[in-house]
Amino acid sequence: MKFPDKYDPKLSERKWQNFWVDAGIHKFDPTKKKIYSVDTPPPTVSGKMHLGHAFSYSQQDFIARFHRMKQENVFYLFGTDDNGLPTERLVEKLKNVKSTKMSRDEFVKLCEKTISEIKEDFINDWKFIGMSCDFSKTYSTIDKHCIKTSQKSFLDLFKKKLVYQHEAPSMWCVQCQTAIAQADLEDQELDSNFIDVYFTLEDNKKITIATTRPELLAACVCIYVHPNDKRYRNLIGKEAKVPLFNQKVQIYSDESADPNKGTGILMICSYGDKYDVEAINKRKLEPRIVFTRDGKLNSLAGKYKDLNIKEARKEIINDLEKEKLLVNKKQIKHIVNVHERCGTEIEFLSTRQWFIKILENKKKFIEAGKKINWYPDFMRKRYEHWIEGLSWDWCISRQRHFGVPFPIWFCKKCSSVIVADEKELPIDPLTTKPKNKC
């Protein structure tokens, strides 16, 4: 065998990739006995491959190759995650459209067409980096088999009463206009203003409250001071008038107010964060919802109606300054939760969503994790910390066009849930009438 004078990686890699395919080296043979399965989440069809793809999936490939070297029958298929929010955002970008401006049927067809146009090149990218999957058996998360599997899982959870629908404040992305789960969040450091503003007491005296979110002044429903904070004990039980918007709010004693943060006085709004949600539920207060689902202010915000959140923030700060209600303003950097898909700061909006019961089953998840062999072992601890840190049940519903539909209907008369029969799966409730009655 003659070796070339100069190694050409492109020629060599393509040669051996073709050899692997022709020889069927990576094909799964169901007739062999000892099977080692690699159950990997399929990569999202959301554009070109990047270094992060290669880094994470090469680790799985190392394991698959190791077990082949041990003469085990490796079951390692290649799939594509080509439904849901990432795919919708890609289609909107490539085709310069907005899903909210199209009918569901039109947009779904456009998504399917776009995926068919780009999928071959996407899969070839994975072949070209040398992934040792069985590419003769690919799957898609939007194919009938996967839809059926997903819908069957939902029905199983529904029968076990592990899934429920509930209207409550939940995390919301105003850019993508959908509810999101805690697992969809990322921390991001952003520039902001930390401002001190005057609230007026009944005797026209002023108290100062610090906030980074003046756009929520219209949503303020009460004020907290710490019971041991001597500066403000005399305020407990009194009312204060919110600057610019003039609604009167009660001042409560509560230990969640941190005397060392800002001015030590905390305004509770509907809804700035999960602590606001807890406080409003605790006091059974009537929320003042000022944000729309697309991230604009509504009529409760008065003259700021129809401004987006950032525009309103700027205008309100300017008006506070004009009215001599702005005590202080300083530039800061702080960590905020953003939606991992688009980088937009998340809000809390009251919407009706489906949830899987996570919080009441935390111990079960941790015990299940202990039965797994973790490599390296510290990843088990990371998993446990992640479970312990979950503070919300898992929101699984999304307000999108292109995805797996819930196999349910709602009775128009009584709003009862009508569940599809497992034999009907996969099913699209928007185009199919229920066989059962409520």
Residue spans for each PLM region:
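Glycine-/proline-rich flexible loop or hinge segments
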Residues: 1-2, 40-49, 100-109, 301
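Acidic, glycine-rich two-metal-ion catalytic cores of nucleic acid-processing enzymes
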Residues: 211-215, 432-438
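Glycine-/acidic-rich phosphate or pyrophosphate-binding loops and their flanking alpha/beta elements
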Residues: 25-27, 194-200, 248-257
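Residue patterns forming the tRNA-binding/recognition surfaces of aminoacyl-tRNA synthetases
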Residues: 15, 19-23, 92-206, 261, ...
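Protease-associated
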Residues: 207-268, 273-278
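N-terminal catalytic cores of NTP/NDP-binding nucleotidyl/phosphoryl-transfer enzymes
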Residues: 28-90, 141, 150, 210-211, ...
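Non-catalytic terminal extensions that flank enzyme cores
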Residues: 1-48, 74, 327, 340
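Pocket-edge structural micro-motifs
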Residues: 5, 40, 199, 211, ...
